[in-house]
Regions:
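Bacterial N-terminal signal peptides
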Residues: 4-14
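Fold-level signature of zinc-dependent metallopeptidase catalytic domains
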Residues: 25-55, 147-423, 427-429, 433-447, ...
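Long, well-structured alpha-helical subdomains associated
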Residues: 417-516
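N-terminal helix-rich structural modules
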Residues: 11, 18-202
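Short amphipathic alpha-helical segments that mediate assembly, nucleic-acid/protein binding
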Residues: 6, 134-137, 463
């Protein structure tokens, strides 16, 4: 290795001066409130499902290993090294490594907290060669056939270099073969144990997908899943591909369905087409026929792994991301109720006492918080998905690349507010346990909770954009005492205007417009930073502790 190159590499590694000591590390860990995740499986699961549950958790643990490999090539070796260090510092490092599933702190802009690793998470994680540039990739895919170009930019491949140093495409089923064979075996065993036909079908097809790299049939089967054990396992979200947002990280959620809450909330799905037909966007961009099936599930989390359990915990998700499945069957919304309740109790309530005026604190509502998350997830399934750009059939995700996640998360938040306001205006939520003031006040308090995660991550950047937009419109005001309030005379029209702008960006695949908006609004302004400075000591999120093992 030539000395200049060696010096350049060494300067990229986290140095001892940058690495937190034991006290600092314990302070970082304390930002996550340990929370035991419990649900009654004794009375709600059959003997066969209880056997299946054990095998599903076994498969989920393998997903943890795959995801760590996806995040960084050196992760597994580092994890094993940390486990062998019995010192207090070593134990703290292992603890925080496990929270993040790697040596970079999600809450600190992916900065390293361990020595001897790159000072920041590689933007392309381990989906691409670490020395690959964006320009090299784009030039390379220009030389490929249409089929290979789709594979190179698809969810389920990694990009490697061949013996000559040329970029090449490797399917997940090859890259993670040994791990996926083990996970497929556990899924097959779970499928054999359960007596539920839809769970058996999904697990069997997902096991086959792990080895074939074709997830389409198993995604359709996941849409049809109707079982007490509500399982999500496989490669889904693309947040860790910060270069293009193409590559899916492996995740697992093993959940117990909440039958009572699912029945209560199912009526939302009956009004999705009506909401789509009235979105604040040009009529030509609306979808006249949404997918025929849009199931909603309210569940309690029993176990999560991989991309589903690192850093900030997911409170709900809307999948799959394959536009073919969304067009044919819609998408499924899964609400993790016990996770949401834990976040509300541990973070949102104490935050509200520091950023909201006293009278506004009385408007805080878990029902409003829970229902807006539901509306957020519903909103991922409406709006533009298949679009035309310069005569080409494409999607907002493909056109907006690495900007898509932040825009889509903001669109889901704001469309969720629009949806609930529409339903209130049309007397569709007459039995709701919250009112307009509670909805917008709780949304504002929740925004501060989300913004504490920083703006490096899609959700945080999208939330900063929302708050700054609403403040510029006068819909959110900063008080002299450092608290914030909603102007109820302006917030409805401001939300509608913002929703129009975000939906139009997606409908037109406007990368340049999205970049302008995010660069201008997706930042932490000084007035917001002052508010965050008052939140020290409040946990930022939860650290789930699973009763099911």
């Amino acid at each position: 290795m030539r000395l200049p190159l060696l010096f350049a590499l060494l300067t990229m590694l986290a140095t001892a001066a940058q690495v937190p000591d034991l006290d600092q590390l314990n302070t970082m860990i304390a930002r996550f409130a340990p929370t035991e995740m419990r649900a009654d499986t004794s009375s709600s699961l059959s003997p066969g499902d209880k056997q299946a549950l054990a095998k599903l958790i076994e498969a989920a643990r393998i997903v943890d290993e795959i995801f760590m490999k996806q995040l960084w090539s050196g992760n597994i070796a580092l994890y094993n090294k940390l486990k062998a260090d019995p010192s207090p510092l070593g134990k703290a490092r292992l603890h925080y490594f496990w929270i993040n599933k790697g040596p970079w702190s999600d809450l600190d802009g992916h900065a390293a907290f361990l020595p001897g690793v790159p000072d920041r998470k590689p933007p392309g994680a381990n989906f691409y060669p670490e020395n690959m540039t964006r320009e090299e990739f784009e030039k390379w895919i220009g030389t490929l056939s249409k089929e290979d170009r789709e594979r190179a930019t698809g969810f389920f491949t990694v990009i490697r270099r061949d013996a000559r140093g040329k970029l090449t495409i490797v399917p997940y089923s090859v890259e993670y073969r040994a791990d996926l064979e083990r996970a497929a075996g556990a899924l097959k065993a779970a499928a054999s144990a359960t007596g539920n036909a839809t769970l058996k079908d999904f697990l069997s097809k997902r096991a086959a997908a792990f080895l074939s790299n074709d997830y389409y049939a198993s995604d359709l089967a996941w849409m049809d899943l109707d079982a007490p054990l509500d399982v999500t396992i496989g490669p889904y979200e693309t947040y860790n591909d910060e270069i293009f947002g193409y590559k899916a990280g492996f995740e697992a959620y093993v959940n117990l369905r909440d039958e009572q809450e699912t029945a209560k909330l199912r009526f939302f799905g009956d009004h999705l087409q009506e909401i789509e037909n009235n979105l604040p966007i040009e009529a030509r961009y609306r979808n006249p026929k949404l997918g025929s099936q849009s199931p909603i599930r309210v569940v309690n989390e029993l176990f999560s792994a991989g991309d589903g359990n690192h850093g900030v915990q997911t409170a709900a998700y809307n999948l799959p991301n394959d536009e073919r499945v969304i067009t044919q069957k819609g998408s499924k919304r899964v609400m993790l109720k016990n996770v949401q309740e834990a976040k509300f109790r541990s973070t949102l309530v104490p935050i509200s006492k520091r950023v909201l005026p006293g009278a506004a604190q009385e408007q805080l509502s878990f029902e409003a918080f829970f229902t807006h998350i539901l509306a957020h997830e519903l909103s991922h399934g409406i709006g533009p998905h298949q679009i035309q750009v310069n005569g080409r059939s494409t999607s907002p995700r493909q056109e907006m690349k690495e900007l898509y996640s932040a825009i889509e998360e903001a669109k889901a938040d704001v469309t969720g507010l629009f949806m609930l306001q529409y339903m209130m205006d049309h007397k569709l939520l007459s039995n709701a346990a919250f009112n307009e003031k509670q909805l917008y006040t709780t949304y504002l308090a929740s925004a501060f909770r989300s913004l504490r995660f920083g703006v490096k991550e899609a959700h945080g950047k999208g939330m900063a954009m929302q708050v700054n937009y609403l403040m510029d419109k006068g819909a959110v005001t900063a008080n002299a005492d450092g608290t914030f309030a909603v102007d109820f005379s302006k917030v409805k029209s401001a939300v509608r205007d913002l929703d129009h702008d975000l939906l139009t960006l997606e409908a037109t695949g406007d990368y340049a417009g999205a970049k302008r908006m995010l660069d201008t609004l997706g930042v932490i302004r000084p007035v917001l930073q002052k508010a965050f400075d008052k939140l020290s000591g409040i946990p930022v999120d939860i650290e789930p502790m699973f009763a099911a093992r």
